[in-house]
């Protein structure tokens, strides 16, 4: 029996019975469903589609969490440029626009999943009508719906949205084996999810923020497993630090006797180099 298991993400292009069966036959041990791109009813349908074809395969439901996305018009930014965003354009909820968990001068805002780096020079107004002025450190083209990261801020209160809670209820009712919790920052985030799911579902903490990496031991103690989510982790940390962070996550999981998962960008290099 292989000690290392394979998780395969399935979506619209791979939800046919033939492809699901082929994925499992090829060695997939767990099929992952990403809640970021499907509503709650669609999630239920996808779970049942997998169960109908291969009831023996485990399912991991990956909830969206507090992911921010740019909702403004496409723009191109030049190095050194000063520009302004509204809170609405950055997708900021009230808890991340003001107060203890809000934006402060000198903090970074990363756009297009880290490709564009800016630093805050001014925050004006109150949510939802306020705005933030930034200086561009590394420019580029920004398209609508691209990711926004705030590596220097911490989400205060619950990391769960109303959609996350509805998706967790579906996962519980459909007896899903694993749930991945996005943008975990502290052990209480996992405890909140576990209180909603009950004792039978395994809770996986996705480590993709610096705050979670600092608390990795405590998070491991309340989780069934941890995932080194290299995509967002590589955005919020300097890229040269990611291999060491990934190693730390895996070693801490082993020491605590919980599952360790390495995920995202696993095959991305093959799009440009088939021998990478």
Which role fits each region the language model picked out?
Residues 1-276:
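Non-catalytic helical/linker scaffolds that mediate oligomerization, partner binding
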């Amino acid at each position: 029996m292989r000690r290392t298991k394979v998780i395969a993400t399935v979506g619209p292009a791979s939800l046919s019975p033939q492809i699901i069966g082929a994925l499992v036959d090829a060695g997939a041990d767990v099929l992952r469903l990403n809640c970021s791109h499907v509503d709650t009813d669609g999630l239920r349908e996808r779970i049942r589609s997998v169960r109908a074809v291969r009831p023996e395969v485990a399912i991991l439901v990956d909830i969206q969490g507090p992911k921010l996305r740019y909702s403004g018009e496409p723009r191109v930014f030049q190095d050194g440029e000063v520009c302004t965003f509204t809170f609405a354009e950055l997708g900021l909820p009230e808890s991340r626009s003001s107060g203890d968990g809000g934006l402060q001068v000198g903090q970074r805002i990363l756009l297009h999943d880290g490709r564009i780096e800016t630093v805050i020079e001014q925050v004006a107004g109150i949510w939802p009508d306020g705005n933030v002025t930034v200086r561009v450190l590394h420019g580029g083209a920004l398209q609508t719906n691209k990711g926004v990261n705030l590596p220097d801020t911490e989400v205060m209160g619950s990391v769960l949205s109303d959609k996350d809670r509805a998706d967790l209820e579906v996962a519980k009712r459909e007896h899903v084996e694993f749930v991945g919790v996005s943008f975990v920052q502290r052990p209480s985030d996992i405890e909140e999810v576990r209180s909603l799911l009950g004792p039978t579902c395994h809770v996986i903490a996705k480590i993709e923020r610096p705050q979670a990496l600092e608390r990795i031991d405590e998070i491991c103690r309340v989780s069934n497993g941890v995932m080194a989510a290299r995509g967002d982790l590589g955005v919020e940390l300097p890229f040269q630090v990611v291999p060491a962070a990934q190693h730390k996550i895996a070693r801490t999981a082993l020491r605590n006797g919980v599952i360790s998962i390495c995920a995202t960008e696993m095959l991305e290099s093959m799009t440009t180099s088939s021998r990478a």
